[in-house]
Curated annotation (Swiss-Prot):
Role played: Catalyzes the oxidative decarboxylation of 6-phosphogluconate to ribulose 5-phosphate and CO(2), with concomitant reduction of NADP to NADPH.
Active site: K186 (proton acceptor), E193 (proton donor)
Top-tier EC class: oxidoreductase
Listed name of the protein: 6-phosphogluconate dehydrogenase, decarboxylating
One Gene Ontology term of the molecular function aspect: phosphogluconate dehydrogenase (decarboxylating) activity
Subunit structure comment from the entry: Homodimer.
Stored SMART domains: 6PGD
Record-stated family: Belongs to the 6-phosphogluconate dehydrogenase family.
Residues bound to NADP(+): G12, L13, A14, V15, M16, G17, N35, R36, T37, V77, K78, A79, N105
PROSITE patterns cross-referenced by the UniProt entry: 6PGD (PS00461)
Organism (species): Cunninghamella elegans
PANTHER family: 6-PHOSPHOGLUCONATE DEHYDROGENASE (PTHR11811)
Record-listed substrate binding positions: N105, S131, G132, G133, H189, N190, Y194, K263, R290, R449, H455
Keyword line: Gluconate utilization, NADP, Oxidoreductase, Pentose shunt
Amino acid sequence: MVEAVADIGLIGLAVMGQNLILNMNDHGFVVCAYNRTTSKVDDFLANEAKGTNVVGAHSVEELCAKLKRPRKVMLLVKAGSAVDAFIDQLLPHLEEGDIIIDGGNSHFPDSIRRTKELEAKGILFVGSGVSGGEEGARYGPSLMPGGNSKAWEHIQPIFQAIAAKAPDGASCCEWVGETGAGHYVKMVHNGIEYGDMQLITEVYQILHEGLGLSHDEMADIFEEWNKGDLDSFLIEITRDILRFKDTDGQPLVTKIRDTAGQKGTGKWTAIDSLDRGIPVTLIGEAVYSRCLSSLKDERVRASKILQGPSSSKFTGDKKTFIAQLGQALYAAKIVSYAQGYMLMRQAAKDYEWKLNNAGIALMWRGGCIIRSVFLGKIRDAYTKNPELENLLFDDFFKDATAKAQDAWRNVTAQAVLMGIPTPALSTALNFYDGLRHEILPANLLQAQRDYFGAHTYELLHTPGKWVHTNWTGRGGNVSASTYDA
C-alpha cells in the first residue's frame, strides 16, 4: 500500500510548475510531482529537485494515493481542454471534500463552470490566478484564489506561505471570492498591466521624440520617479531597459522592432468590459495600441504619406514639463485602476461574488508585474470603505487627480500639438472629464436614435418612463424602426 506522505500534489512540470514545487518545498511542504510525460518526473527528481523532500508519481492514481486527506491537487497545465481532461482523470481517485486547484491561465467562465460541476460531485474546486512569472513562482508569486470557499482553510497555510510578501510583511495572497472570482481578478490584473505598460511607453515617446532626451537621460528620470509616488516594478524595469547597451554601445531598445505581441488576456478584459457596459477605456486603448503597432508595414507607408503638424518642436521649459509628465502618468494610472475596480464591482454584482477589494490590492503589492507602492493607497481606501462606489471618490485619489489636473491637461495638449500619439493618457483624461460631467450629450444621441429608429427615450423629470416623438416636419421623416444604433 502506498503511504500518503504529501501535503499537496502538482501536475505540470514546465518551469512554472517546477518552481512552485521548489517554493513549497522551501517552506516545509511535501509535494508530489506528476507530469503526463513521466520521464519529466524522473528528470526533475534527479536534477532540480535532488536533495529535496519532493516525491514523484508515474500515474494519476499513484499521485492521489500519495496525498494526505483532504487531497489537494494543483494543476499547472495549458488552459482549456487539458484542464478538463486532468480533472476527469483525477475524479475516480478522489473522494468528497478533496480539492482541485487550477493555477493556469484559465478564462473565468471555465472556472465558474468547473466550480459548480465539481461541487455537485463533492469536490472543492479553486481557480487561482498566479502572477509573477517563473521567478515569482520560485521565490514568491502573487496568488489570487477563488472558487469553493470550503477549500480555503485547507490551502491557506500553503498558499500564504509561498506567496510573495509585501514590504510590511503581509502575504500577497487572500481569498478573492466565489466560483470564477480568482481567475476574473487575474484577468483584470493583466488588463491593468496592459494599461500601465502603455502609459509608460507613451511617456517614453514624449520624452524621446518630443523632448529629444537620450536614453540615459530618460533612465535618470525613471529612476527619480521610482523614488516617489510612481515607485513600481514597471518603472524600475523601464529604467533598466533604457540604460541597457548592446555590444556596440547603443541602447538595445532602439533596435527592437516596434510591434508588440499579446497573449489575449488584455483583450479578454476589454471584451468583458463591453459585455458589462463598463467603460474600461484605458485598457481598451492599450489593446488597440498593440494592434496598431502590429501594422508595421502599413505604418511605414503611412509615415511617407500622411501629414503631421507643421511644427512638432517643443518650445517650453523641459524641466517643468518633465515634472508634469510624472503627474500626468500618476493621474492616468489612478484612472486605470479605478476602471479596473469598476469592472470587478460590476462582475461581483452580476455573479453575486463578495469580492475582497482591499485584499485584492494587497495581493498585487508584491510578486506580480503591477506591484507598486501605489497599491497600498488602494488597500487603505477599501479598508476604510469596503463599499466604495468608485476609487476616484476616495479622498486620497480625489485630491491626487485634482492636484495633477493642470499638468495632465498640459501634457496631453502638448502631445497633440507635437503629433505624438497618447491614446491611454488621453482616454484617461477624457474618462475623468466624462465622469465629472452631470450632463453629457447623450441626450442628442437618444433623440437621433428615436428619430431614425423609434427607439424611444426618457425625459429628465420622468426617468423610467419611455416615450417616442414623431419628428416628421422637424428635420425629416422617421425611418423604419429596424435600425439598431
